UniProtKB/Swiss-Prot annotation:
GO terms for biological process: translation. One of its GO terms (molecular function) is structural constituent of ribosome. The keyword Ribosomal protein applies. One of the primary rRNA binding proteins, it binds directly to 16S rRNA central domain where it helps coordinate assembly of the platform of the 30S subunit. Belongs to the universal ribosomal protein uS8 family. One of its GO terms (cellular component) is ribosome. It holds the Pfam family Ribosomal_S8. Keywords: Ribonucleoprotein, Ribosomal protein, RNA-binding, rRNA-binding. This is Small ribosomal subunit protein uS8. Gene3D superfamilies: 3.30.1370.30, 3.30.1490.10. It comes from Levilactobacillus brevis (strain ATCC 367 / BCRC 12310 / CIP 105137 / JCM 1170 / LMG 11437 / NCIMB 947 / NCTC 947) (Lactobacillus brevis).
Length: 132
């Protein structure tokens, strides 16, 4: 069975594991999921990312991050550009999430970057998701 939207599936798995406070989760690997996971790690939303080679496409293991008193670090994830309705922005219209408290993940000609990096490089692209 083919998956229509693997990015939405990845974000949903993170959201669900986060809601029940799991320590980690595993998803089938792809380059875009790996790039998104690296951005989430770099921005401090997740603790760590591991890549496991299973002689097929591989597996990405994501270790979730929680604050004091087991508070969630990720309070929300939202898929923006969907297969049925793509969402593109120009360099001067890159969105801010919660006035800069969250991040927008954008797929550009220079790879997958955050909204801050896209503004700094003055490039637009496809808005994949918001994380806050």
């Amino acid at each position: 069975m083919s998956m229509t939207d693997p990015i939405a599936d990845f974000l949903t798995r993170i959201r669900n594991a986060n809601m029940v406070r799991h320590e980690s989760l595993e998803v089938p690997a792809s380059k875009i999921k790996r790039d998104i996971a690296e951005i989430l790690k770099r921005e401090g939303f997740i603790r760590n990312v591991e890549y496991i080679d299973d002689d097929k496409q591989g597996i990405i293991r994501v270790f979730l991050k929680y604050g004091k008193d087991n508070q969630r670090v990720i309070s929300g994830l939202k898929r923006i550009s969907k297969p049925g309705l793509r969402s593109y922005v120009k360099a001067d219209a890159v969105p801010k999430v919660l006035n800069g408290l969250g991040i927008a993940i954008i797929s550009t000609s220079e790879g997958v970057v955050t909204d801050k990096e896209a503004r700094a490089k003055k490039i637009g692209g496809e808005v994949l998701a918001y994380v806050w």
